[in-house]
């Protein structure tokens, strides 16, 4: 059985044509992208690395990592977002290989092939997040790093990421997130360790609605990222 939620795919298919519009529903992704790429690059030194971006969507993160000197492959199960990603790289001149394939299927095909694997804002959109984490472990080389980001599951996260972001501030389309699919850091850490990944670092991402700016912070109550390592 494929680890794909067709309803989740459909949400992003419908919006795909606006993926690179910085004033669209994807504005938050554009705004946080530099922060996330810097955090990853500081830890993984992307230049010259072979990188896999799992759940790449329209390619915002994939292109940014390629611009840092990485050789990037982006995978997603959404046909429309991938088409947008492929079109945009023709416009930008940034080279990324895009494929429509699940992480689990690619892990069968390309085990231990990547220096770095990123899986950002994707785990909360699949039926079995732990399956994706195991696949990421299989695809990264021994000694390589895997980065995940998702949303914490607690009342504050519901208030900020669902009620605030989708209904009050209109940062995201209503229905983008399902609170039940949010993932606590303890759960993500346990799934990572069970898969053979050692958690090395965690950082939160906070939003100030007055200044409309994001910043990295120790507060992991809502959005957060983790750095994991596959032991050599």
Curated annotation (Swiss-Prot):
Gene that specifies this protein: ubiG
Enzyme superclass (EC): transferase
Enzyme Commission number(s) of this protein: 2.1.1.222, 2.1.1.64
Example GO molecular function: polyprenyldihydroxybenzoate methyltransferase activity
Gene3D superfamilies (alphabetical): Vaccinia Virus protein VP39 (3.40.50.150)
Keywords associated with the record: Methyltransferase, S-adenosyl-L-methionine, Transferase, Ubiquinone biosynthesis
Catalysed conversion reaction: a 3-demethylubiquinol + S-adenosyl-L-methionine = a ubiquinol + S-adenosyl-L-homocysteine + H(+); a 3-(all-trans-polyprenyl)benzene-1,2-diol + S-adenosyl-L-methionine = a 2-methoxy-6-(all-trans-polyprenyl)phenol + S-adenosyl-L-homocysteine + H(+)
NCBIfam families reported for this sequence: UbiG
Pathway linked to the protein: Cofactor biosynthesis; ubiquinone biosynthesis
Function: O-methyltransferase that catalyzes the 2 O-methylation steps in the ubiquinone biosynthetic pathway.
InterPro entries in UniProt: SAM-dependent_MTases_sf, UbiG_MeTrfase
Protein name per Swiss-Prot or TrEMBL: Ubiquinone biosynthesis O-methyltransferase
Source lineage: Bacteria, Pseudomonadati, Pseudomonadota, Gammaproteobacteria, Pseudomonadales
SUPFAM superfamilies: S-adenosyl-L-methionine-dependent methyltransferases
GO aspect biological process, one term: methylation
Pfam families on file: Methyltransf_23 (PF13489)
Family: Belongs to the methyltransferase superfamily. UbiG/COQ3 family.
Binding site for S-adenosyl-L-methionine: 36, 55, 76, 120
């Amino acid at each position: 059985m494929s680890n794909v939620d067709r309803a989740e795919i459909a949400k992003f298919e419908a919006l795909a044509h606006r993926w690179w519009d910085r004033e669209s529903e994807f504005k938050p992704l554009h705004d946080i992208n530099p922060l996330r790429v810097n955090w990853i690059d500081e830890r993984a030194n992307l230049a010259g690395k072979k990188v896999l971006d799992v759940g790449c969507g329209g390619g915002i993160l994939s292109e940014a990592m390629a611009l840092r000197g990485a050789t990037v492959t982006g995978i997603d199960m959404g046909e429309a977002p991938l088409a947008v990603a492929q079109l945009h790289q023709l416009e930008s001149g940034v080279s990324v290989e895009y494929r429509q394939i699940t992480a689990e299927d690619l892990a069968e095909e390309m085990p231990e092939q990547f220096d770095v694997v990123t899986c950002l804002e994707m785990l909360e959109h699949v039926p079995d997040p732990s399956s994706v984490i195991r696949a990421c472990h299989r695809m990264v080389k021994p000694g390589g790093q895997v980065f995940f980001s998702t949303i914490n599951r607690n009342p504050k996260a519901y208030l900020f990421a669902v009620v605030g972001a989708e209904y009050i501030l209109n940062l995201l389309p209503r229905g983008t997130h399902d609170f039940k699919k949010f993932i606590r850091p303890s759960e993500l850490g346990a799934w990572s360790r069970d898969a053979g990944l050692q958690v090395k670092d965690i950082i939160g991402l906070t939003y100030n609605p007055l200044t409309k700016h994001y910043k990295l912070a120790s507060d992991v109550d809502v959005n957060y990222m983790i750095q994991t390592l596959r032991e050599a």
